[in-house]
C-alpha cells in the first residue's frame, strides 16, 4: 500500500459502516485517507446519510448485507485491499438470544476471515471490545492496566464471550495464506467505553433525565472509575492501523491494542454529567441512593423475570447482574502500545471531545437548556 501514497487506488470495506462507530470511521476515511479510490459500506440496514457522501471524489458504494451470510460478505469484499470489520451485535440487556449474538459476532467474524482468504484481501482490522478482558464476573478491578496486565478474564454473559471468541479467531488468522499466496495480516482494537455524537446510551440517559424533571439519580459510587474514549479517536486509531498494517506487518500482525485518549477517569455517571450538566441535567446524590445489596437483589429478580417471561414477552431491563457488575467495577486503561507500534496520538483533545459531544446533546430535540 505504501507505493500508492497520495494516489487514489485503494478499496476499503467497512462492515457495520452505518453503526455508531462505523459512521465515524466511514466519514473519517473520506476526510483523511488520500489513497482511497472506493469505500464500500456494508450493513444490514443502510442509512440515508450515505447518499450525501456519494457526491465527493471517492466512490462510495452502499451494500446492504448480513455478515452471517458468507456469500454476501465475500461478494462485498471482492477486490478490496483492506477490511475494517466493525459489524457486531452489542447486547448486554438480553434483547437478543445467546444463539443470535454468537451467530452475528462469532460466525460473522469467521465469514469475514474466510472471505479475506477467498478474495485475496490481505489486511483485516477488527473492532473488539474491552469486555474481552473485563470487568470479569468476579468484580476484580482493572486499574490503569495495559495489554499485558495479568487479569482473570472470566465471563458468563453471551456478549463478552462472543467478542472474546471472535477476537481469538481474528488473531489466530494472522499469517494465514489468502488467495494468491500472500499472508493475511490482522489485528484487533479494544475500545473502552465509547462516547460521542450518535451514542445511543448517552441519548437514552439524556431523555431519561428529561422525564425526571432534569434529574438523574446516582446509583454507582463516585470512587468506581471507568475508562472512556471519544468515538472520533477510536475511528482515527482504526484508520491509522489500516494504513500501517502493510509496512509494519511483522510488528502489528496478530496484536491487540486498547483504544485510549486523554478522557478523564471518572465513574460512569460522573463522566456522563460532563456532557449532560451543560444541557440542564443534574445528578442527585453524593452517594448511591439505594444500597448495593438492594441493587443486587433487584438485578437478580430482573434476571429471573426475564427468564420466566421469555416464552411470552421480551423483558429487557437496564439493570441485570451483568450491567450492575460492569457499572460497579473499576476498569481503567493506561497504555502507550498504539503510539509505540504505529504512532497513534489522539486526534481530538479532551476539550474538543467534550465540546463536540455537548453540542450534539444540545442539538437534540427537547433540550433542557
From Swiss-Prot:
Catalysis performed (reactions): 7alpha-hydroxycholesterol + NAD(+) = 7alpha-hydroxycholest-4-en-3-one + NADH + H(+); 7alpha,25-dihydroxycholesterol + NAD(+) = 7alpha,25-dihydroxy-4-cholesten-3-one + NADH + H(+); (25R)-cholest-5-en-3beta,7alpha,26-triol + NAD(+) = (25R)-7alpha,26-dihydroxycholest-4-en-3-one + NADH + H(+); (24S)-7alpha-dihydroxycholesterol + NAD(+) = (24S)-7alpha,24-dihydroxycholest-4-en-3-one + NADH + H(+)
Tissue specificity remark: Predominantly expressed in liver.
Entry keyword annotation includes Heme: no
An annotated GO cellular component: endoplasmic reticulum membrane
Pathway of action: Lipid metabolism; steroid biosynthesis
GO molecular function: cholest-5-ene-3-beta,7-alpha-diol 3-beta-dehydrogenase activity
Lineage: superkingdom: Eukaryota
UniProt membrane topology term: Multi-pass membrane protein
Chain ranges passing through the membrane: 289-309, 312-334
Database matches in InterPro entries: 3Beta_OHSteriod_DH/Estase, NAD(P)-bd_dom_sf, NAD(P)_dehydrat-like
Key words of the record: Endoplasmic reticulum, Lipid metabolism, Membrane, NAD, Oxidoreductase, Steroidogenesis, Transmembrane, Transmembrane helix
A Pfam family annotated for this UniProt entry: 3Beta_HSD
EC number annotated for this UniProt entry: 1.1.1.-, 1.1.1.181
Claim: NAD is one of the keywords in the record: yes
Active site per UniProt: 159
Any GO BP annotation: steroid biosynthetic process
Family: Belongs to the 3-beta-HSD family.
Function noted in UniProt: The 3-beta-HSD enzymatic system plays a crucial role in the biosynthesis of all classes of hormonal steroids. HSD VII is active against four 7-alpha-hydroxylated sterols. Does not metabolize several different C(19/21) steroids as substrates. Involved in bile acid synthesis. Plays a key role in cell positioning and movement in lymphoid tissues by mediating degradation of 7-alpha,25-dihydroxycholesterol (7-alpha,25-OHC): 7-alpha,25-OHC acts as a ligand for the G protein-coupled receptor GPR183/EBI2, a chemotactic receptor for a number of lymphoid cells.
Protein name: 3 beta-hydroxysteroid dehydrogenase type 7
Source organism of the structure: Mus musculus
Amino acid at each position: 500500500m505504501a507505493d500508492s501514497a497520495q494516489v487514489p487506488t485503494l478499496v476499503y470495506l467497512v462492515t457495520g459502516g452505518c453503526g455508531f462507530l462505523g459512521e465515524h470511521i466511514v466519514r473519517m476515511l473520506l476526510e483523511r485517507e488520500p489513497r482511497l479510490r472506493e469505500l464500500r459500506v456494508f450493513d444490514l440496514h443502510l442509512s440515508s446519510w450515505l447518499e450525501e457522501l456519494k457526491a465527493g471524489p471517492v466512490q462510495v458504494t452502499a451494500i446492504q448485507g448480513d455478515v452471517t451470510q458468507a456469500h454476501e460478505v465475500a461478494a462485498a469484499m471482492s477486490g478490496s485491499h483492506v477490511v475494517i470489520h466493525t459489524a457486531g451485535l452489542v447486547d448486554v440487556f438480553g434483547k437478543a438470544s445467546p444463539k443470535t449474538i454468537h451467530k452475528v459476532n462469532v460466525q460473522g467474524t469467521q465469514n469475514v476471515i474466510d472471505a479475506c482468504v477467498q478474495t485475496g484481501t490481505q489486511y483485516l482490522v477488527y473492532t473488539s471490545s474491552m469486555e474481552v478482558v473485563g470487568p470479569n464476573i468476579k468484580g476484580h478491578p482493572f486499574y490503569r492496566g495495559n495489554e499485558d496486565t495479568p487479569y482473570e478474564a472470566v465471563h458468563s454473559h453471551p456478549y463478552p464471550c462472543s467478542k472474546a471468541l471472535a477476537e481469538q479467531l481474528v488473531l489466530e488468522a494472522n499469517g494465514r495464506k489468502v488467495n494468491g499466496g500472500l499472508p493475511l495480516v490482522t489485528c484487533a482494537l479494544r475500545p473502552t467505553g465509547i462516547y460521542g455524537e450518535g451514542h445511543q446510551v448517552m441519548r437514552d440517559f439524556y431523555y431519561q433525565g428529561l422525564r425526571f424533571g432534569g434529574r438523574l439519580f446516582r446509583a454507582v459510587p463516585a470512587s468506581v472509575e471507568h475508562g472512556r474514549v471519544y468515538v472520533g479517536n477510536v475511528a482515527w486509531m482504526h484508520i491509522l492501523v489500516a494504513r500501517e498494517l502493510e509496512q509494519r506487518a511483522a510488528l502489528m500482525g496478530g496484536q491487540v491494542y486498547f483504544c485510549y485518549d486523554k478522557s478523564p477517569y471518572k465513574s460512569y455517571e460522573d463522566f456522563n454529567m460532563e456532557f449532560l450538566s451543560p444541557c440542564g441535567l443534574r445528578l442527585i446524590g453524593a452517594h448511591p441512593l439505594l444500597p448495593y445489596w438492594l441493587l443486587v437483589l433487584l438485578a437478580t429478580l430482573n434476571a429471573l423475570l426475564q427468564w420466566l417471561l421469555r416464552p411470552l414477552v421480551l423483558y429487557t431491563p437496564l439493570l441485570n447482574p451483568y450491567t450492575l457488575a460492569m457499572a460497579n467495577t473499576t476498569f481503567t486503561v493506561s497504555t502507550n502500545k498504539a503510539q509505540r507500534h504505529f504512532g497513534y496520538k489522539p486526534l481530538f483533545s479532551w476539550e474538543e471531545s467534550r465540546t463536540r459531544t455537548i453540542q450534539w446533546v444540545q442539538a437534540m430535540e427537547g433540550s433542557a437548556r
